From Swiss-Prot:
Record's keyword terms, sorted: Lyase, Metal-binding, Plasmid
A Gene Ontology molecular function term of the record: aldehyde-lyase activity
Organism: Terrabacter sp. (strain DBF63)
Reported cofactor(s): a divalent metal cation
E.C. designation(s): 4.1.1.69
Entry protein name: 3,4-dihydroxyphthalate decarboxylase
Alphabetical list of SMART domains matching this protein: Aldolase_II
Active site: E84 (proton donor/acceptor)
Biological role: Catalyzes the decarboxylation of 3,4-dihydroxyphthalate to protocatechuate (3,4-dihydroxybenzoate) during phthalate metabolism.
PANTHER family with a match to the protein in the record: 3-OXO-TETRONATE 4-PHOSPHATE DECARBOXYLASE-RELATED (PTHR22789:SF0), FUCULOSE PHOSPHATE ALDOLASE (PTHR22789)
One Gene Ontology biological process: pentose catabolic process
Family the UniProt entry places it in: Belongs to the aldolase class II family.
Lineage of source species: Bacteria, Bacillati, Actinomycetota, Actinomycetes, Micrococcales
Binding site for a divalent metal cation: E84, H103, H105, H171
Length: 239
């Protein structure tokens, strides 16, 4: 592997481990990417030493171009980008403001969608960023395919619209953000809302959106709290 971007590689590796610790993907499925420039991104790759999402290290994170070729000499020796690299590439192409894409397979998100339970703003101060995210709508890409080529990725991006997240029916979740941290934390919020929705349904209840006046009263606690403190907690809780 070529040198460079040590801190960025570690951040992507930490993000993969956080996703696994939060149950967003089992085993070795799922990947996180970080835009480096207009043509290249860091992404968790497949290789002879990978051990699964929960044990991702910086050595699993490699620099590639948008076509999956090495982003620097020696970068992919013995490694290959994930099959769903086009998913990451097309989300980043369509969103100049996005720096990171997370693709995971959260069981609760898949189950809630298949049960007909949309991701709705059913909570308030329990998760303020999550409530606001859900209030804006969480769209669904209605195909359970492996998003392994540009055509399928463009379909998913079209379903995503202008929203930062999209549920992939029978498959998982794609989340984007202005940072790796934001993209992962958004995925955690969607998963949390899906889990709550399933618990409500199991108890015989029905989803009810937070009243509009309560939603409007929720403050923006700022990135220092919503992202900074939240991310330090996610990394620390892994031990």
């Amino acid at each position: 592997m070529s040198g460079g971007y040590a801190a960025e590689r570690q951040l992507v590796a930490d993000a993969c481990r956080v996703a696994a610790a939060r149950g967003l993907s089992d085993g070795f499925l799922g990947h996180v990417s970080l835009r480096i420039d207009e043509e290249r991104l860091l992404i968790r790759c497949r290789g002879p030493q990978e051990r699964g999402l929960a044990w991702t290290t910086a050595a699993d994170v490699h620099l590639v171009d948008q076509g999956g070729a090495p982003g620097a000499p020696g970068e992919l020796d013995g490694w290959s980008p994930p099959n769903e690299l086009p998913l990451h590439v097309e989300v980043l192409r369509s969103r100049p403001e996005a720096a990171s894409v997370v693709h995971v397979h959260p069981r609760a998100v898949v189950a809630a969608d298949l049960a007909g339970l949309a991701i709705r703003p059913i909570v308030g101060a329990f998760d303020i960023p999550g409530a606001k995210l859900a209030a804006g709508g969480v769209p669904v890409y209605p195909r359970g395919v492996l998003v392994r080529n540009r055509g399928l990725a463009l379909e998913m991006v079209a379903a995503m619209g202008k929203r930062p997240v999209v549920v992939l029916r029978g498959h998982g979740l794609t989340s984007s953000g202005g940072s790796v941290q934001e993209a992962v934390l958004r995925a955690i919020s969607v998963d949390s809302l899906a889990r709550l929705s399933l618990q409500i349904a199991a108890a015989g209840g029905a989803q009810a959106d937070l009243p509009a006046e309560d939603l409007a009263a929720l403050p923006d606690l700022g990135p220092g709290f919503n992202e900074g403190v939240a991310w330090r907690h996610e990394v620390a809780r892994m031990g």
